[in-house]
Amino acid sequence: MTRILNCLLVLLACLGVSSKAEDQAVTQWPLQDNGLNTVVQWDHYSFQINGQRIFIFSGEFHYWRIPVPALWRDILEKIKAAGFTAFAFYSSWAYHAPNNATVDFTTGARDITPIFELAKELGMYIIVRPGPYVNAEANAGGFPLWVTTGDYGTLRNDDTRYTNAWTPYFTEVTEITSRYQVTDGHYSIVYQIENEYGNQWLGDPTLRVPNETAIAYMELLKANARDNGITLPLTVNDPNMKTHSWGKDWSDAGGNVDVAGLDSYPSCWTCDISQCTSTNGAYVPFQVLEYHDYFQESQPSMPAFMPEFQGGSYNPWGGPEGGCPGDIGDDFANLFYRWNIGQRVTAMSLYMMFGGQNPGAMAAPVTASSYDYSAPISEDRSIWSKYHETKLLALFTRSAKDLTMTELMGNGTQYTDNPAVRAYELRNPETNSAFYATFHSNTSISTNEPFHLKVNTSAGVLTVPKYASTIRLNGHQSKIIVTDFTFGSKSLLYSTAEVLTYAVFDKKPTLVLWVPTGESGEFSIKGAKKGSIKKCQGCSRVKFIKEHGGLTTSLTQSAGMTVLEFDDGVRVILLDRTSAYDFWAPALTNDPFVPETESVLIQGPYLVRDAKLSGSKLAITGDVVNATTLDVFAPKGVKSVTWNGKKVDTHSTEYGSLKGSLDAPQSIKLPALASWKSKDSLPERFADYDDSGAAWVDANHMTTLNPRTPTSLPVLYADQYGFHNGVRLWRGYFNGTATGAFINVQGGSAFGWSAWLNGEFLASHLGNATTSQANLSLSFTDATLHTDTPNVLLIVHDDTGHDQTTGALNPRGIMDAKLLGSDSGFTHWRLAGTAGGESDLDPVRGVYNEDGLFAERVGWHLPGFDDSDWGEEGSAKDSTTSVLSFEGATVRFFRTTCPLDIPAHTDVSISFVLSTPAGATTEYRAQLFVNGYQYGRYNPYIGNQVVYPVPVGILDYKGENTIGVAVWAQSEEGASIGIDWRVNYLADSSLDVASWDTKDLRPGWTEERVKYA
């Protein structure tokens, strides 16, 4: 019926008699709610909040990937500044539950209440996504690692052991969220249960054979959410267009939620595109996927909702330094996000908007320390062209109210005079405004294609432009051409320049349009009769033509900003792309809808965070990285402007703005990293090392509930003994002689391991980007065996995290251990890992922060540790880089302290840079520690990441900083590593990071550490 109606609407629209059919389209889709509130409603077209339709343009960030609560404001202000109406976040069960007796939502960055409070202060709705499973390229997909042993079943089902495990966490996060719902005046609008759990059906979803176990699990999650106060709509995110799970339109089977959604990563969620072919098919750059028919078939009575749409891609081990932004950069943002609009999507959340890092052991094996994700906000918190390109569309969707209710009237090349260009016509059945999303017929092609567009307007069918040069799609680009677009009390008959935003000052609208640099635009304002040029910066060939009961304007815009005024009170600002990147529309209200009278327009700065109007004073906050002008369009009553609290000397321009200038920030220089000290960190390799202390446990279990049984006994799975992260040390004892040992270790992609016998190095598995398990037959031929005392074989292995989804239970540890040439075998094994195991010795940094290296267990990485008896390291200097070297296969820990004194009223981002000197071996692994936090894993033999941003709060910008590097040499060549740091960017900023008191995030060394030697 829907498709037939759409075809009828296309025909009627072309004939100009569509109103009756449009009325039918409206009445076909009644508003729905969940029966618990009518604040959040929805229908076929969009979500509706407090009676208003909204285009939800959201972006994801993970607070646990930036564990400095003060910086959450920075990320959220940048998301808001880009025109977004919402943001989303995963809550991490793992981050809050170090063991099965603890749920911590109060310590440090584990207190998530500031996120909800910031949302209300800044004016953005929240999509809350608590799991309990989240995927997210997180260790075990966000499961706490104590559930990966098999003791809690196979997970993600209705097994009571698993239910009892997740219930305390899920109850707590649900109760917290329940206090911040939009139904009670706060800003959380939906609550997602589980994640990409497309398991409602056994086999082919079209056969609708229920998976009763999965349904029972979803019912448990739903009941918990409702029992603990959630009245918001419950949502899910299908992992792809094949699963059709949990939507009421598809089936009335159990487990259904209020609103289903679809996740999509059309250019692959990883830089390793081979991982996505089973979902997306063969990879073709910039090839789009069709969503409209999926939503029409799977959930026609619901909005086209995408809880995750590709905001970038994660960088796997072996991927390029800095990620793979080539086909997921600003062109991707321009094309694919507009494509979604052409598919009638009215709610989408970009995954990720800010990725951040994977400090400690937060990552799954698929990725390294960086979680930059090529997101619009980089992991160092800078914004780049992709951010600005995304902003151009998000600001448009925030202002285009009619876009929230449209039908797809038709699509194809018949709309254009160039067969290389196609258009999708969306039309609002109530207002008759239309949106023509234009694309290359083959979106993988990047040719420069000129075209005219046939549009149906209130003045009849027109072919535009009529006077200006043709519309162009130059490169991997898309454009949305509007007709009968309402701005304030005025109407735009059509515009071939894209709408950026608009605002109404003193009852007169200011419309902002933009074109790519050097291109032409044409627009027609209904009711206008005369136009004039008030500012021409880069404009040419300006024409005003009276027609269609209004005034048509055509012009070409090179670099700069042009301002036109019309006799009906309309002001039009036309920008080229570069100028549009530096154009902002900060809200004067915390209403996410941002009413048309509640914003100002600003051109010039690197970032505008906020604006507040008080009487005749406009207070603007933001960032400046270079000297720039500040051009402010505001109500006439504004007489003075401040920037970050300082008065700006402004003057009135002839085009109605207040204009001033902003100075560049003062430069800074980081002190050199020098005066290194070092000490061996592998005493455990020697046979006479005493492993009877608190750090060690007997590895003596003869059974396991893990579905993967070991080849040999005892069970040498580290998680079974409460040690879950990174480096673990196994000491296997045996008496008498043996010719060698066969050892098989599993640690995840890019893991490695090394072996020593009685202090003598035997061999290493160096690792690679794909191998998760590796065995070696170790020869004892050249080693010294003891005949009168026990021999000790030390196995040091790291792991790169636990696998995601069904792989979360894959063991980490020794799968098989056999002596060769010996009948007696190993007498016993001892195991050490993170100091205190699951006891959460350092609740601020958390159990995922540390591995089992001696240096970490005893706290050499912590501020305040006394290294006065250490010898100073004679580190070589390569330019400003310190080169730290040693010989032999061992682990060595390097340590220094360095002060910072960052000036006030600035935002500074700092990265460490690790390197391997030319000609030196890459057969080593290293970990970077900053004030006790492990903030980088450097595996030069495998990966390419060399730059490690470390945020303020982890770094002390007004004090001493403790820097540590643990280097594990996997060959007798030893290792040489270079280390330096650099400023990523410096901004004059309202953030004023140097003034923050963050010392509570950096607890120091305590005597308790001594017992873990």
Curated annotation (Swiss-Prot):
Disulfide bonds join C271-C324. SUPFAM superfamilies: (Trans)glycosidases, Beta-galactosidase LacA, domain 3, Galactose-binding domain-like, Glycosyl hydrolase domain. It is found in: Secreted. It comes from the Eukaryota. GO terms for biological process: polysaccharide catabolic process. It catalyses: Hydrolysis of terminal non-reducing beta-D-galactose residues in beta-D-galactosides. Glycans are attached at N100, N211, N411, N442, N456, N626, N735, N768, N775. Pfam families: BetaGal_ABD2, BetaGal_dom2, BetaGal_dom3, Glyco_hydro_35. GO terms for cellular component: extracellular region. It is an enzyme of class 3 (hydrolase). Keywords: Carbohydrate metabolism, Disulfide bond, Glycoprotein, Glycosidase, Hydrolase, Polysaccharide degradation, Secreted, Signal. The keyword Secreted applies. Substrate binds at Y90, N135, A136, E137, N195, Y265, Y373. The active site is at E196, E308. InterPro entries: Betagal_dom2, Betagal_dom2_sf, BetaGal_dom3, BetaGal_dom3_sf, BetaGal_jelly_roll_dom, Galactose-bd-like_sf, Gly_Hdrlase_35_cat, Glycoside_Hdrlase_35. Its EC number is 3.2.1.23. Residues 1-21 form the signal peptide. One of its GO terms (molecular function) is beta-galactosidase activity. Cleaves beta-linked terminal galactosyl residues from gangliosides, glycoproteins, and glycosaminoglycans. Belongs to the glycosyl hydrolase 35 family. This is Probable beta-galactosidase B. The lineage of its organism: Eukaryota, Fungi, Dikarya, Ascomycota, Pezizomycotina.
